[in-house]
Amino acid sequence: MLKYIRDEKDMFYLFSNEVQHKDVAESLRATVKSAGFYMADGEDSLAYGKSPSLDIGALPDDIVLIKQQMAA
């Protein structure tokens, strides 16, 4: 499992579960549109949950956009 942040330009940043969402958001200096957790098992993947440190959750289209960016 990884954590992720989506910024206002719909760019995704995946990072270790050991790092807090708020720390990554502060280092990016970007407006956070969504944040949550990413899990992949073969072809199946899921973006879900909510960042407690940002009080921002996943959006329904996050997984679609993450898959598109990873395929590019």
Regions found by a protein language model. Name each.
Residues 1-72:
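Intrinsic low-complexity, intrinsically disordered or marginally ordered coil/linker segments
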